[in-house]
Design a protein with these regions (language model features):
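Flexible, gly/pro- and Lys/Arg-enriched active-site loops
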Residues: 13, 57-75, 88-179
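Hydrophobic alpha-helical segments and helix-packing faces
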Residues: 36-39, 43, 68, 72, ...
Length: 179
């Protein structure tokens, strides 16, 4: 069950178990992307940083959307995890993972060693300055929806593949394959 956190002025919903002393785990869906350096190694690093992986999609290669025109192609995947972290603690973990890959935040939609985004967090809707769940741009991003549809098609909007502008997206492989 999720309850509204009235201690803040933002709309945050927290998962609570019937026994409030019990630490619960929740599932979350994470998107990963990389377009600088050894892209596969950065994706592996991020995947390895999550202890309890439930599902991992295939990896897709796409051209960048927005930002500088001279960027290299991205590798993208989506994974679902089980976590005992609350959504904001999970966000901090995602940012630490990006930092561990030497992520630099210099240009909006610019090239990056690693991008780690929380798409969904089980049973929670959050809208704050720091975090919005579900991710606000998910329905506009074929590079997220294609891998998401592999592991959680129920989370994709109806007819998304027909309504989004087609962009080139190529199946690249899986996280277990060597490239």
């Amino acid at each position: 069950m999720c309850i509204r956190d009235s201690s803040t002025s933002v709309n945050i919903w927290r998962k609570q178990s019937a026994d409030s002393n019990l630490v619960t785990s929740s599932s979350a869906v994470i998107a990963l992307g990389s377009n600088i350096g050894d892209r596969m190694s950065y994706l592996r690093f991020a995947c390895d940083s999550f202890d309890r992986k439930l599902k991992i999609s295939s990896i897709y290669e796409t051209e960048p959307i927005g930002g500088p025109s001279d960027q290299d192609a991205y590798l993208n995947l989506v994974l679902s995890i089980e976590t005992s972290l609350d959504p904001h603690a999970l966000l901090r973990k995602c940012q630490r993972i990006e930092g561990g890959a030497a992520r630099q935040r210099t240009i909006r939609w610019g090239p990056r060693t690693l991008d780690v985004d929380i798409l969904f967090y089980e049973g929670c809707l959050i809208e704050s300055e720091l975090l919005t769940i579900p991710h606000p741009s998910i329905n506009e991003r074929r590079f997220v929806l294609t891998p998401l549809s592999e592991i959680h098609p129920e989370l994709c909007p109806a007819n998304w593949s027909e309504t989004l502008d087609p962009e080139e997206i190529k199946l690249f492989g899986s996280i277990d394959e060597s490239h």
